[in-house]
Regions:
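Single transmembrane alpha-helix segments in multi-pass membrane proteins
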Residues: 33-101, 125-131, 268, 272-282, ...
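Inter-helical junctions in multi-pass inner-membrane proteins, predominant
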Residues: 42-54, 149-156, 174, 196-203, ...
Length: 344
């Protein structure tokens, strides 16, 4: 196939239409409203101002991580090291705070970001530079980083007494009576990333790479750079999420956020970011995080065992993947039919 024709094939794929506001996000939002209403019937406190603040606060860490890995999933990759990075960031920041009582919340975020940056660079070099499968690489770094948490922590725990007052006060800050500071930051990050993915060449390239990686290579898209930076971004978001974790719980140990990576992946996939690549938005990912957390809140109100809550998360993930596959097949058929009509 001539290079120009191949480039046209990549740039005119269905991913362009998926950048527009889609009915999927609207449908997810409606489902979220129904889920919130249903949970409110089970637990009336859920619909109060305190209940709303609790929901948004508890969703902040997962939502921020969902924003971080959404571009990676769009490019047909995955990052399973995020939960371990959250744990490492949270513990190291707490350790610095305990040893430096004069630390401010700004310094906490800087340290958390640097830790996440280091993990992101490692993942990016291995996946983009050596072209190793992201699933294998990040599964490896998941265990490496979690092992590092166990080693550096040496079974030492930290609580609110060792945290800077400015950080804890920021974690308690609420706007308009129901919007926590952490979720306000999630909203800002979501808007900025949504604009980046939709209106910049780098963002559009991510969709093209995810739609057809070999073709993206052939037409000269900067696959290495885009992939590397996506993993770096995910790492930084995980580092910041570690500080969010501290702000929420005001305590940390070596098991912080253990095993939560699949909850984030579930939120992203349920939010419409297909694991087949080339489709999805960060807005959908955040709605997915809210939906998962709302369902978990409803299950907790019903007294459902933690094991069954995890099982339901897995079931939701499978359903979302199946729905993505059905939609992908339908879109392929529609696109093929359209091309046939154009040639007649």
């Amino acid at each position: 196939m001539p290079l120009l024709l191949l480039e046209s094939e990549v740039l005119n794929m269905n991913w362009l239409t998926k950048l527009r506001p889609s009915s999927r996000e609207s449908s997810l939002f409606i489902i979220l409203i129904v889920a919130v209403g249903g949970t409110g019937l089970i637990n009336p406190r859920f619909l109060t101002g305190d209940g709303t603040r609790d929901l948004l606060t508890s969703t902040s860490v997962v939502a921020l991580l969902a924003i971080g890995i959404a571009p990676i999933v769009v490019m047909r990759h995955i990052d399973l090291s995020i939960a371990s990075t959250v744990g490492l960031s949270a513990w190291v920041v707490a350790d610095f705070c305990a040893k430096n009582p004069s630390f401010t919340w700004v310094q906490c975020f800087v340290i958390g970001s640097i830790i996440g940056l280091a993990v992101g660079i490692l993942n990016g070099l291995l996946v983009a530079g050596l072209r190793l499968p992201s699933l294998v690489v990040t599964l490896g770094t998941l265990y490496i980083v979690r092992g590092l948490v166990y080693v550096v922590s040496n079974s030492v725990d930290y609580n609110a007494q060792e945290m800077p007052e400015s950080l804890l006060a920021l974690g308690q800050k609420v706007y308009f009576g129901l919007l926590p500071f952490t979720f306000l930051m999630v909203i800002i990050a979501m808007i900025l990333m949504a604009l980046f993915m939709k209106y910049t060449k780098s963002g559009r390239d991510a969709y093209a790479i995810g739609s057809n990686p070999p073709a993206a290579d052939l037409v000269g898209l900067k696959v290495f750079r885009r992939t590397f930076l996506a993993f770096v971004f995910s790492g930084v978001m995980a580092g910041v999420a570690g500080v969010f974790y501290l702000m929420r719980f005001a305590q940390v140990d070596s098991t912080a956020f253990y095993g939560q990576e699949l909850a984030v992946v579930a939120a992203v996939v349920i939010g419409g970011v297909t694991i087949m690549g080339g489709s999805g938005t960060v807005v959908g990912a955040v709605i997915g995080a809210l939906l998962v957390q709302t369902i978990q809140g409803g299950l907790a109100a019903l007294g459902v065992d933690a094991f069954w809550k995890a099982a339901i998360n897995g079931l939701l993930l499978i359903i979302a993947i199946y729905a993505d596959r059905v939609l992908a097949v339908r879109n392929e058929k529609q696109l093929l039919a359209q091309r046939i009509r154009e040639r007649i």
